Amino acid sequence: GMLVESVLFENSPVSYKHEKNALFIDLPKSFGKNAIATFVVIYRGVPADGLRIGNTRHGERSFFNENWPNRTRHWLPTVDHPYDKATNEFIITAPSHYQVISNGLLVEESIINANQKLTHWKQSVPISSWLYVLGVARFAVQYVDEFMGKQIQTWVYPQDRDKGFFDFVSPTKEVLGFYSNYVGPFAYEKLANIQSPSVGGGMETASAIFYGENLVNGKRDVRLRNVVIHEIAHQWFGNAVTESTWDDAWLSEGFATYFTMLFQEYAYGTSVYVDELKKARTRILNFYNKDSTYKIIDNRTAEEGPVTNDMTYQKGAWVLHMLREKMGHEVFKEGIRAYYQKFYNKNVTTDDFFAEMQKFTKAPLSTFRNQWLHHPEVLNLQVAWRYDSASSQVEITIDQKQSTGFYFEAPVEIEIVESTDKKIISLDISGRTSTFKIKADKKPVALLADPRTTLLAKFEIRVL
């Protein structure tokens, strides 16, 4: 662990206590409200966590942080919680054969002597502690392009230079453009894609994103492409607009997952978007089969256990998808833009999000929010139908089969397939059983549930 040697205020030592992973400082004088004071903490040691000191896949020594969710405290004195956002600087002295990457803009890079180099990075945009970034290794660095006057960079191991430069050049700029147009301005001074041994997938560290070293293979495959899209989405959601508590982590991970899907819809077509929704729905149902009690919002903290899982990511994304369908695509977009603008570089709660979105629709959102975020149940529907030739009607009965006794209010889309035609109808369900009668001149060939993939539910169709 780390040993604190001294704490200074105005170059004079002050008394302190370092115990139970917390640093308590005796203030040397009284400070008024909103006063700014600077303390210097001098400490040393080998971090127990949070800063990975080890080899790259090529056997070279390296130093990379792994802060998520609350491990920054193991190597930096910080308020290690999402609600505390601060600007940051890293001034690093390292052996001269290393390159150093961090948040923000490069202020200085100077040779100190034959063996050492000083590198100074400074970020002027406030961020939460898990988003601080430090990577020290041998790198090949490419200045790929610019976006709105801000550099796009690639940092990869020199052994992977050609592969990494190829992998990261696309779709980075296109993704930045899409999110800027859909949501609002990119908050940071640069965007660097960085190969790292400290993550398996990606980590959205602000302005300088880590990607698992083994994702770099020179094939620009779908796996890496989707991680790039997801981590760049975090620069808007999670980074610029940051959850106030761990319990609101879906505002980061659910949003990044869904906005990955929105970019896929934009860039690769509706079929890819729908496929991603279906895969997400399968993961949600599988998770629910293993744990039927997990609520997206449930007073959890990083100190007590994991704050994210498939419900945070995939169900969070589905909540946004259903909200977009409920509000209408353009109205949803207007609400998202207003939400981002209001909480740009600030902290936010689920209450804040729904209060902002409610301004853009007359339909009350309280029931929607409550059933999808504050309840663990997954909608389980049995759709039974028969054709009554005497009345020329299709009789449809929709039963909610949840065993807990909690029932959703939701629109269920049904496609009625006839021999020469088909049509989609929307049926509003509530309570255990809902029944409907639909005019039809002849018996349908089939009825299909949720043909447009708009509802998070498990479906069973029965013909009576």
Regions found by a protein language model. Name each.
Residues 4-8, 101, 365-366, 379-381, ...:
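Beta-strand-rich binding/interaction modules
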Residues 33, 42-89, 139-144, 453-464:
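Glycine/proline-rich low-complexity spacer/linker segments in large multi-domain proteins
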Residues 253-318, 322, 326, 343:
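Acidic/His/Gly-enriched intrinsically disordered linker/tail segments
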Residues 232-247, 262:
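Catalytic Zn2+-binding segment of zinc metalloproteases
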Residues 223-236, 250:
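Short alpha-helical catalytic segment bearing the HExxH-like zincin motif
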Residues 66-70, 78-229, 258-261:
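Hydrophobic helix-coil surface modules that form long, contiguous segments used
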